[in-house]
Amino acid sequence: MAFISGPALPTARVNRTVAATPVRMASGEDTPVVSRRALLSSTLAAAAAALLSAAAPAKADREYGNVGFLGGGDKIDVNNANVRVYGRLPGMYPTLAGLIVANGPYKSVGDLYNIPGLDDKQTGLLKKYEDSFVALEPRPEYEIDKFNNGLYR
């Protein structure tokens, strides 16, 4: 369809005026459109609003200091780590890892050998990886995530 112009298409011309307030501070006119006082006060008000609306720093407590033992470091905290962390130690996940998580908390790494139902192979794995474990104070905020931390591949 071609563009058709002419009397068949009524058009209404609307004259709109745009209110403009140019700032003529250094012009040769005697009367500026915006006074210096108005310009400075509006600039000062905008700067004050920007300063007052700035975000304050968070006053949250520091995250769990031993977070590296939850899977991000070389050692695994047997009282707080998730069952999936043991997957990086061949033979531990899921059976032996599940037993460790289910039977905690432990006062020491040596308490792992007292888990009921351990067979010789599992005891051998515990001995093999004993230096990879640490038994820290159990934290209630990690208790719920021990079996299912909600991270899926």
UniProtKB/Swiss-Prot annotation:
It holds the Pfam family PsbU. GO terms for biological process: photosynthesis; photosystem II stabilization. It is found in: Plastid, Chloroplast thylakoid membrane. Predicted to be translocated into the thylakoid lumen by the Tat system. The position of the transit peptide cleavages have not been experimentally proven. GO terms for cellular component: chloroplast thylakoid membrane; extrinsic component of membrane; photosystem II. Keywords: Chloroplast, Electron transport, Membrane, Photosynthesis, Photosystem II, Plastid, Thylakoid, Transit peptide, Transport. The keyword Zinc-finger does not apply. It comes from the Eukaryota. It is a peripheral membrane protein. SUPFAM superfamilies: PsbU/PolX domain-like. One of the extrinsic, lumenal subunits of photosystem II (PSII). PSII is a light-driven water plastoquinone oxidoreductase, using light energy to abstract electrons from H(2)O, generating a proton gradient subsequently used for ATP formation. The extrinsic proteins stabilize the structure of photosystem II oxygen-evolving complex (OEC), the ion environment of oxygen evolution and protect the OEC against heat-induced inactivation. PSII is composed of 1 copy each of membrane proteins PsbA, PsbB, PsbC, PsbD, PsbE, PsbF, PsbH, PsbI, PsbJ, PsbK, PsbL, PsbM, PsbT, PsbX, PsbY, PsbZ, Psb30/Ycf12, at least 3 peripheral proteins of the oxygen-evolving complex and a large number of cofactors. It forms dimeric complexes. The oxyThe extrinsic subunits in red algae are PsbO (OEC33), PsbQ', cytochrome c-550 and PsbU. Belongs to the PsbU family. This is Photosystem II extrinsic protein U, chloroplastic. The lineage of its organism: Eukaryota, Rhodophyta, Florideophyceae, Rhodymeniophycidae, Ceramiales.
